[in-house]
Curated annotation (Swiss-Prot):
The gene is comB. HAMAP family: ComB. One of its GO terms (molecular function) is 2-phosphosulfolactate phosphatase activity. This is Probable 2-phosphosulfolactate phosphatase. The lineage of its organism: Bacteria, Bacillati, Cyanobacteriota, Cyanophyceae, Gloeobacterales. Its EC number is 3.1.3.71. Keywords: Hydrolase, Magnesium. It comes from the Bacteria. Pfam families: 2-ph_phosp.
Length: 236
């Protein structure tokens, strides 16, 4: 198995791997994992808010939730922003979630044509790694979402956790990501607080989100794409 890491969707090369993994630790893939683990029937992601609204209009209002975030803040008129702490079983069980975020949804759009598309965050990275190890994938691409096209510490450390568990680092970015995880595994909250996007969230009073997203393997979820942009709880 050859595992390559790309820090942002803009750096993803042409071609298609056997498996592609989208990572947006703060906070889209943490929220997706939490929602599915707590009983959401699906999470449907869109980069464009208008497209999200049009798709959501095809479902009874009582059966859906709309999550919208831009710049770390909830989009006006949406049910929630991009916080995994919102996604309790009381709120999301049995619901189809339509979601658009600043960074993570762009990553999923970039890799949507891979035969197997998964999402990972620190909260479910071990669950995802176990599934990937059980398959006969020759090539795995782990793609960070970054922030508006720039490198992010939090996505890279999560990618590193995957590389550590899968082995087979195929590019320098994968080696560097694994080294970052080795260095910070015991203090992930501090790393996320130091990260530029962590700093943005702290200014918005979202420390609890950072603490939640920094926890390793607290969520049993394997978000897997079944149609372009549609993620459900997969089998592990």
């Amino acid at each position: 198995m050859q595992v390559s890491v790309f820090h942002t969707p803009e750096l993803v090369p042409e071609g298609t791997p056997d498996c592609a993994v989208a990572v947006d630790v703060l906070r889209a893939t943490s929220t997706i994992a939490t929602a599915l683990a707590n009983g959401a029937t699906a999470v449907q992601v869109y980069a464009d808010l208008e497209a999200l609204g049009a798709a959501a209009a095809g479902y009874p209002r009582e059966d859906i939730l709309r999550g919208g975030e831009r710049g770390g803040k909830q989009v006006e008129g949406f049910d929630f922003g991009n916080s995994p702490l919102y996604c309790t079983s009381e709120r999301v069980a049995g619901k189809r979630i339509f979601m658009s975020t600043t960074n993570g949804t762009r990553t999923l759009e970039r890799i949507r044509h891979a035969p197997v598309v998964l999402t990972a965050a620190l909260v479910n990275v071990g669950f995802v790694a176990r599934y990937i190890r059980s398959q006969a994938f020759e090539t795995v691409w782990v793609v960070g979402s970054g922030w508006q096209g720039n490198f992010s510490l939090e996505d890279t450390v999560c990618a590193g956790a995957l590389v550590e568990q899968l082995g087979g680092a195929a590019n320098d970015e994968a080696v560097a990501a694994a080294a970052l995880f080795d260095t910070w595994e015991g203090d992930l909250i501090e790393l996320l607080e130091r990260a530029s996007h962590g700093q943005r969230l702290l200014k918005l009073g979202l420390l609890d989100d950072i603490v939640y997203c920094a926890a390793l393997d607290t969520v049993s979820a394997l978000p897997r794409q079944t149609a372009a942009g549609v993620l459900v709880q997969g089998m592990a």
